[in-house]
């Protein structure tokens, strides 16, 4: 089972998507209760990035919590989150930078690094641009130091993108991106102890592939992000 921590709604979605079996949510819930099947509990997300101390550039919140998009590459969200792995009593960290498309909720590009620095964010952006030539989305982030860096703003301008930033300490302004972090960590990270960097990075890479290509979402009409994306391209 790709995701043994699925709740009854996701189990029902998989039955519809993979096996064309249509049953009521309540029936699946009764079966899950009878078999003691439970989803992973939801943890609070405390990963909101703080405002840069000396921002070189600050953009207005042009997105303004309008998380609807009519086509791919219309609106991109981005953020950085951290993970820990353990070597005996020593705690190590890795950082994941990712860009999410609001139309199909696919992860457009991502980079994992030992350092939370400008190159991490710049490399993620460069990968997204390379994979989507000609894309000119509204590009939304929080006010972390990488995104308020003037060099990064110039990279956005050169790519023909408009920059948007969340208000200070308003994580909900970047809600779907924060939501993706929560999904990833709830399904693959929390309640686990990683004892090597390779194991942790493999988990992240495998999960992003699973999320894009195998994990259906009701908000996408019980499709995966890539199915939603490809349907638009084929229309």
Annotated model-derived regions:
Residues 1-71, 170, 226-230:
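Basic, flexible linker segments flanking DNA-binding modules
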Residues 4-5, 20, 67-68, 86, ...:
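Conserved, non-catalytic sequence blocks in retroelement Pol enzymes and Pol-derived host proteins
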Residues 11, 28, 32, 63, ...:
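Mobile genetic element proteins and their domesticated derivatives, centered on retroelements
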Residues 52, 141-143, 149-152, 163-185, ...:
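RNase H-like two-metal-ion nuclease catalytic core shared by retroviral integrases
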Residues 65-108:
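An active-site-proximal beta-strand-loop segment
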Residues 74, 106, 114, 126-130, ...:
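Retroviral integrase
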Residues 92, 111-132:
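Active-site beta-loop-alpha junctions of metal-dependent nucleic acid enzymes
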Residues 157-161, 183-235:
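C-terminal domain-tail junction helix/linker
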């Amino acid at each position: 089972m790709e995701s043994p921590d699925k709740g009854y709604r996701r189990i029902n979605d998989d039955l519809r998507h993979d096996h064309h079996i249509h049953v009521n949510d309540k029936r699946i819930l009764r079966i899950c209760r009878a078999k003691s099947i439970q989803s992973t509990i939801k943890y609070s997300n405390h990963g909101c990035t703080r405002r840069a101390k000396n921002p070189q550039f600050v953009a207005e919140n042009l997105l303004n919590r309008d998380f609807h998009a009519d086509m791919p590459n219309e609106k991109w969200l981005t953020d950085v989150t951290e993970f820990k792995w353990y070597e005996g009593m020593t705690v190590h960290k890795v950082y994941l930078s990712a860009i999410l498309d609001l139309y199909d909720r696919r992860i457009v590009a991502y980079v994992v690094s030992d350092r939370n620095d400008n190159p991490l964010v710049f490399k993620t952006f460069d990968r997204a641009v390379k994979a989507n030539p000609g894309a000119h989305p509204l590009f939304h982030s929080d006010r972390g130091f990488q995104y308020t860096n003037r060099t990064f703003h110039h990279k956005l301008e050169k790519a023909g993108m408009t920059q948007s930033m969340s208000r200070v300490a308003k994580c909900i302004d970047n809600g779907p991106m924060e939501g993706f972090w929560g999904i990833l960590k709830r399904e693959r990270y929390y309640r686990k102890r990683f004892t090597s960097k390779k194991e942790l990075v493999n988990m992240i890479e495998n999960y992003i592939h699973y999320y894009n290509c195998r994990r259906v979402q009701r908000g996408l009409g019980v499709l995966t992000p890539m199915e939603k994306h490809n349907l638009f391209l084929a229309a």
